[in-house]
Amino acid sequence: MVDLSIEIAGIKMKNPIMNAACPISRDAETMKLLIDNGVGGVVAKTISVKPAIVPRPSMAVVDRGMGRFYYLKTLKPGDVRITPVDAGNHRFIHAFLNAELWSDIPAEHYLEREYPNVKNYCRERGVAFFVSIGYKPEELALLGPKVEKAGADAIEFSTHYIGKDYRPVVEAAKALRESVSIPIFAKLSPFTPNIPDLVKDLEKVRVDGIVATNTIGPALNIDVETGMPIVGGPYGYGWMSGPALKPISLAVVAEAARSTKLPIIGVGGITRGVDVIEYFMAGASAVQICTAALVEGFSVFQRILNETVTWLEKHGYSSILDVKGLALKYLKPEPRRVWAKPPLVDEKKCIGCGFCQQVCDYDAVHVEESGGGKRLAVVDRTKCYGCGLCTSVCPTRAIHFEE
């Protein structure tokens, strides 16, 4: 039996999967649905001193979810080929835009009605209750004590998106820390500058954890049939989330993990159990999910939980903590190598689909029939540049680097 339980900043959770602060946690009823669908911690949608004026439309899938992908088609026994298709299936959505801002409901409504309601539900079911607030130091100092009194286990705080100066984050953290006694978590932007120095300064003001990252932007997507932007923010801009954000957020998580012992909650582009594993390997102690739930529904949390357990069992791990930080030892400041190293082909795994041949820009990989009639990938070592693209698309990991 795999153990998914964690503890962050003294808060015990039955599993590390949480929702991110967004419309799926806009009130007590939606937060109860999140709890019923298996989250280990629930995060209430961000509030501030004044209700937001939210542009409409406020959310949209980029390119209507159309993504070019490939499936394996068996033409005859031993003859498997890659076949391109276009699909609007939610599993292939690559990006999502929002112009949501924070909640357009007054903070007093949450403090008086929503938080007490969901707090009791959390206590009954052993789920941690986080509240997200923003944005300026004086606003956090005002809201923080009220949120603590309303029963939050911890506070996640955001600042408005920063440029080259991270001091607003530290100033906000200091103001909140001086006003509450419960754990506080600083939510970082994808392009937060100088993360090592920032997390050290956050440690000095006694922040209890990091959340990485927020959405990225401004971003624009245009409906070519109408010429209009897909969301209704100023200039048509929104903020991007979804799978396209994951590599950026992972980099922030890893850089923070190399710089601090504070727990880090990874956010951005999680749609599968392996994404949870990836964030943990980068140093995360928990994860948050929003976009996948907006598109797939609340059941996504249980699916991702199940996939996480299955992966851990298959790979012989007994706890989610066993994989935490495993990738950090490979994240070195120098390049892995600067010379061509051709990949190897495991003939037992190769199914001859031809994906490696299709993506090779150096004409170095070809699928050929072997003596027994089986189609196999063959690497021409004299042409191979060692770029690695073929290894990243192989569905069976047959073509690989021997490190």
Task: Locate each region found by the language model.
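Glycine-rich beta-to-alpha transition loops that act as phosphate-gripper elements at the mouths
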Residues: C22-I24, S132-P137, L188-N194, L262-V274
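Active-site-adjacent beta->alpha loops and helix N-cap segments on the catalytic face
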Residues: E29, I53-S58, A107-N117, Y121, ...
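Catalytic cores of alpha/beta
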Residues: E29-L34, L140-K149, T192-V205, V253-S259, ...
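Glycine-rich phosphate-binding active-site loops on the catalytic face of alpha/beta enzymes
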Residues: A44-K50, A154-I162, G209-A219, G269-I270, ...
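C-terminal helical cap(s) of enzyme catalytic domains, especially alpha/beta-barrels
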Residues: P51-D79, N221-G238, A292-Y317
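Active-site beta->alpha loop and helix N-cap motifs at the rims of alpha/beta catalytic domains
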Residues: F69-R167
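Glycine/Thr-rich beta-alpha phosphate-binding loop at enzyme active sites
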Residues: A95-L101, I105, F157-P168, L198-L262, ...
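Iron-sulfur cluster-binding cysteine motifs and their immediate structural context
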Residues: F355-G372, V378, L389-E403
